[in-house]
Amino acid sequence: LFRPDGTPAAFVKVGLGPVADQLVATEAAALAAWARHPDPRLVVPDLLAATTWNGIRIAVVAPLPEDVRRLPPGTPSAWAVRDLDGPPSCAALADAPWWTRRTEREGDGPVRTLLEQIGDRHADATGSWARWHGDWVPWNLARCHRGLVAWDWEYSEPDAPVGLDEVHGAYQQARIVEQQPIAAALEVARLAAERLVAAGTSPGSPAELRRRAGTDEVPSPFPSARWLADLHLAMLLTRSTELERLAGTPPHDRAELLAAAEAGGRRR
């Protein structure tokens, strides 16, 4: 929406169809949560209204700051997002609500088999879980005089694996910007997980500094790079299944995703 003078007044998101309806609902809930617990490290557009019209869900979101500028190359850390629901929690995979939500929704089939393999592989690993943005990519991020700006929260979710935003951001850039096939993009995500885990245990990292100060028994929020890469794959698989359930037809790249996931599991 634009004012008479041509300046933006709001972005209006309309939930036409089951998929869009869920995305609009998710974004409205995330923005409402952010309004209750704002963090000065991140600038998030205000939720102006969340309503329905003839049964169609609508979210009205404030425009971006006037002085937003494109980010330099690279993906910034998502630490501010992780604190939205309070400090990250620690839990084994089997006890994590994020994992339970995924396994409970899956019936029999190849995705169920892949999830069981991931669950068995990391049964004894304890990781950190917190809010994630869901689409932490350069085209949803910018800078303004107040700091980092983030919008498009349609895939945000609580209790996600810490680090998922950065790993999925690397995957999305490989797929969308570089148009790499899924198998190659998964390899990019795996390398991003390795870099993140290495940085998370390096001297001077937040986790290492807390450990040295005696305030954190866990030296890193990531049990391993493979843990993070595998949970990213689980997210992709279950997101694809959920989109199929809502739309009534599988996403166009579902077969490619399953093939890449099964091939990757055989190689590891």
Task: Outline where the language-model segments fall.
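Active-site acidic catalytic loop and adjacent metal/ATP-binding pocket
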Residues: L1-R3, D120-L164
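ATP-binding glycine-rich loop module of kinase domains
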Residues: L1-A25
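Conserved hydrophobic/aromatic residues on the N-lobe beta-strands of protein kinase domains
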Residues: F11, I58-V60
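Regulatory N- and C-terminal appendages and interdomain linkers associated
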Residues: L246-R268
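All-alpha amphipathic helical-bundle segments outside canonical DNA-binding/catalytic cores
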Residues: S220-L233
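Conserved kinase catalytic-core helix
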Residues: E27-V44, R57, L64-E104, D108-W139
